[in-house]
């Protein structure tokens, strides 16, 4: 396990982006713990501000309403320092969000195979209950085949955006959270960032 000590002048944030089910939250929490930094999740920030779940926001007001709230939440992070931040999977679709995230720090794209993403979402009851479907159906009502098609379609749209924004890309398909964190820390060292 790699441990990093921080210097007083190190104020770079580590920004985790990627599709749902790639490990942004679990990796972010462990990375923050190892670095002794605060962890923030933009989806949690939005839910706290709105006093309700993202699933409820999307069901009642639609995706455009949620994306507006997401834009406001990300804009409010300007000036954030010395944190680990996990974003919602679609946060980068808004060019302003992408600009703010890139300006905040070092961006790491977490990826996984479509098969792994679908399996992770289907096997995580909390994830299925909390995350809204892009098709408008409740996540618990979507078949594996429908979820696979939805995932393929969304990834085709988002991967080019993710790749342009990312400073590093890590495939989380076959490695543990601890191994992913170790890899992120190794890459920081090789980039000569003071992490």
Swiss-Prot record:
Residues bound to Mg(2+) are 25
Specify which residues bind ATP according to the UniProt entry for this protein.
Answer: 21-26, 131
E.C. number(s) listed in UniProt: 2.7.1.71
Q: Which class of enzymes does this protein belong to?
A: transferase
Disulfide pairings? none
Compartmental location: Cytoplasm
Keyword Nucleotide-binding tagged: yes
Q: What is its main location?
A: cytoplasm
Q: In which pathway does it act?
A: Metabolic intermediate biosynthesis; chorismate biosynthesis; chorismate from D-erythrose 4-phosphate and phosphoenolpyruvate: step 5/7
Q: Name one GO molecular function term.
A: ATP binding
Q: Where is the composition biased (Polar residues)?
A: 132-141
Region spans: Disordered: 128-148
Q: Which cofactor does it need?
A: Mg(2+)
Keyword list, A-Z? Amino-acid biosynthesis, Aromatic amino acid biosynthesis, ATP-binding, Cytoplasm, Kinase, Magnesium, Metal-binding, Nucleotide-binding, Transferase
**How many cofactor units bind, and how?**
Binds 1 Mg(2+) ion per subunit.
Catalyzed reaction equations: shikimate + ATP = 3-phosphoshikimate + ADP + H(+)
- Residues binding substrate, per UniProt: 43, 67, 89, 158
Q: Name one GO cellular component term.
A: cytosol
**Subunit relationships:** Monomer.
Role summary? Catalyzes the specific phosphorylation of the 3-hydroxyl group of shikimic acid using ATP as a cosubstrate.
In the record, the note on similarity to other proteins reads: Belongs to the shikimate kinase family.
According to UniProt, the name of this protein is: Shikimate kinase
Organism of derivation: Syntrophus aciditrophicus (strain SB)
């Amino acid at each position: 396990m790699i441990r990093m000590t921080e210097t007083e002048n190190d104020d770079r944030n580590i920004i985790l982006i990627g599709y749902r089910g790639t490990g942004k939250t679990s990796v972010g929490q462990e990375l923050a713990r190892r670095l002794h930094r605060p962890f923030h999740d933009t989806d949690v920030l939005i839910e706290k501000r709105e006093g309700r779940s993202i699933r409820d926001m999307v069901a009642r007001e639609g995706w455009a309403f949620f994306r507006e709230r997401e834009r406001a939440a990300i804009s409010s992070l300007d000036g954030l320092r010395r944190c680990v931040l996990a974003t919602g999977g679609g946060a980068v679709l808004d060019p302003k969000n992408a600009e703010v995230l890139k300006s905040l720090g070092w961006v790491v794209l977490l990826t996984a195979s479509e098969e792994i993403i679908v399996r992770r979402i289907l096997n995580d009851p909390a994830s299925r209950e909390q995350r809204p479907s892009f098709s408008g159906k409740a996540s618990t009502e979507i078949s594996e085949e429908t979820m696979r098609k939805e995932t393929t379609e969304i990834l085709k749209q988002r991967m080019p955006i993710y790749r342009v924004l990312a400073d590093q890309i890590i495939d989380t398909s076959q490695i543990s959270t601890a191994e992913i964190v170790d890899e992120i820390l190794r890459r920081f060292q090789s980039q000569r960032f003071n992490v």
